[in-house]
Amino acid sequence: MARSITQRRTSLVTASLVLGVLACMSPPREANAASWQGIEPFKTHRAEVLQILGTPISESADGVLRFSVSGGSVQVSFVNEKFVTAKKLRPELAGTVLLIVLQHEHSSETPESMNLPKNKGFVRDEARTIVIFRNIKDGIVYTFIDGRLKTTRYTFADSQLSRARR
C-alpha cells in the first residue's frame, strides 16, 4: 500500500536528522599544510625531496636546496635541531621540510585570476607595488609584485605546529 505524504515527509525529516547528527559526531578532519609536488612541510624528508626534484642546482651552508623547475626555481629548507629546540617540537621532525619557496619568473597569475581578494581564508597586506596574501591556517603565502605572482611559500599549517609540539 502506498505511504501517505505525511509518512514520507516524516521519514525524510528523520533521515535528514540522523545524517546531521552523524556528521556532527564524526571526528574533525586533520588540517595539513599545503603541499607542492607531493612535498609537505613537517612530513617530507630530505631524501624524498631529492627523489621528487632530482639533483639541486645549489645548496646553501645551512642546507637549503635550490632546484630549477618549469617556470622558475624552488628553494626547500629543512627543520634543524635549533628550530626543534626553539619551538619545542618532537625531535623526529628534524630533517623534514620546513619551507618551500617557489620563485615564478614569468607568471601571468594575478590576485584576481586566483580569486584571492574574495577568499576569506587569506589576509591581504599591501605596500606600494607589493601585495601579499597569507593563509596561516593552511600555511601558504602568495607575493605579487606589480600585479603578477612572484613567489609562493608553503610552510606548516597553524594546527600542525601545535600537534608537532612535545
Where are these regions (language model features)?
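Bacterial N-terminal signal peptides
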Residues: 14-26
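Sec/Tat signal peptide C-region and signal peptidase I cleavage site
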Residues: 27-33
